[in-house]
């Protein structure tokens, strides 16, 4: 019962490199854990929250152990139209999560595959942040009208790209 309500002040230091065993998220020793946290809204709709102060506050006040940085690929100022702005927002939160010893989900938040753009993005993220055990990749947030075959093909390609640079973090 204690593990259900446990909180880690420094989750990455305590749990280390995450792994999946069966259907369980586990710490570096193979013990099941539960991460607790929140998702930022799309970077292009709520950029004012993409800063180090919000990360620190969510850790301290909400006792988060994980955050999710949702990078929008549709609507104005999205990654496809304005990658510099998107990366600036994402990098602020990712760097702050690492500094504050939190896990961070890098989320490709879209309704459409955009495979080539996603491959380039995740290649960049894996090269930059793949050495940190804080990272979790979410490669396609909301497939809407895609067939299983197309989602599987997309996922296989994106996972292969990430694994070129990051063999360990959870996807």
Where are these regions (language model features)?
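Bacterial Sec-dependent N-terminal signal peptides
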Residues: 1-9
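Active-site mouth of glycoside hydrolases
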Residues: 11-170
